[in-house]
Amino acid sequence: MRTTIRIDDELYREVKAKAARSGRTVAAVLEDAVRRGLNPPKPQAAGRYRVQPSGKGGLRPGVDLSSNAALAEAMNDGVSVDAVR
């Protein structure tokens, strides 16, 4: 189909340069751009990964899992929660 559109001069220069670099027509470059705009590629799902354990694992001795303050202190390497604030 033949049609007339108005586009920015700078954009036209970019399209024309891309067409020249790729050995295609301006119409083909514009058609591809419109198709991609109307039907963008679907994002691919991230591949699964596995966390590799390091060290001997397990709980750090003396950390009370029922206390948020104790957990925060353990995560901050002994610095008290009040000192972090």
UniProtKB/Swiss-Prot annotation:
One of its GO terms (biological process) is positive regulation of growth. Residues 37-60 are annotated as: Disordered. It holds the Pfam family RHH_1. It comes from the Bacteria. Keywords: Toxin-antitoxin system. GO terms for cellular component: plasma membrane. Antitoxin component of a type II toxin-antitoxin (TA) system. Upon expression in M.smegmatis neutralizes the effect of cognate toxin VapC43. This is Antitoxin VapB43. It comes from Mycobacterium tuberculosis (strain ATCC 25618 / H37Rv).
